[in-house]
């Protein structure tokens, strides 16, 4: 997908001002390819971008946190980078930031099962791909997961209020607890509703009933 340099610079400028690490996992619509925006734009020092379809990890010792993920390097990915892998240190806060599809094992968008997620051993998985994400939160073993959805709905296949997830992960020696809440961003929204227009003879009368 195309993005202007002005938009990219606006986004990276905001990234540089947030005062915390930013992790990016390129997906099927913005893969990490030769000549892509990921290579053309210099990211701020606090931004880390996954660049391989093989599992990678960014470590933040000051936060006692490891973040695992990968990048799409084309428009499709049928491999499962998390399969047959596990976290390096269960004593740390272990997060996953990834573009993945938990709806079908035959998906061409990095299929991911709850069994694979559970065996990997992370504490929380921040997932992208599904824009209507309200029904895609849960637990896989000791790992909580959620899809972030999209910031703003763009059509009638993205109905309802949209926004971002704010997640707090607390971990002690025994277990981790992820608290997830939604922060609304959309000022407008798309809705799919049914309206009884019985008796309406003109477009104006239909509009009045709506």
Describe the predicted segments one by one.
Residues 54-63, 147-210:
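Binuclear metal-dependent phosphoesterase catalytic core
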């Amino acid at each position: 997908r195309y993005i202007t340099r002005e938009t990219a610079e606006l986004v990276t400028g905001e990234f540089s001002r947030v005062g915390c690490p930013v992790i990016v996992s390129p997906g099927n619509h913005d893969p990490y390819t030769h000549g892509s925006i990921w290579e053309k734009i210099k990211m701020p020092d606090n931004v880390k971008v996954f660049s391989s379809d093989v599992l990678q990890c960014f470590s933040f010792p000051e936060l006692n946190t490891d973040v695992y993920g990968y990048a799409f390097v084309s428009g499709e990915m049928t491999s499962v980078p998390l399969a047959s892998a596990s976290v390096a240190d269960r004593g740390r806060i272990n997060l996953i930031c990834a573009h993945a599809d938990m709806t079908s094992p035959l998906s061409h968008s990095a299929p991911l099962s709850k069994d694979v997620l559970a065996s990997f051993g992370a504490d929380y998985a921040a997932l992208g791909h599904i824009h209507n994400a309200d029904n895609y939160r849960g637990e896989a073993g000791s790992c909580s997961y959620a899809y972030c959805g999209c910031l703003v709905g763009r059509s009638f296949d993205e109905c309802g209020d949209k926004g971002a997830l704010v997640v707090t992960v607390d971990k002690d020696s025994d277990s981790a607890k992820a608290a997830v809440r939604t922060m609304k961003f959309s000022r407008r929204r798309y809705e799919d509703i049914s309206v009884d227009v019985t008796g309406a003879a003109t477009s104006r009368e239909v509009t009045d009933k709506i």
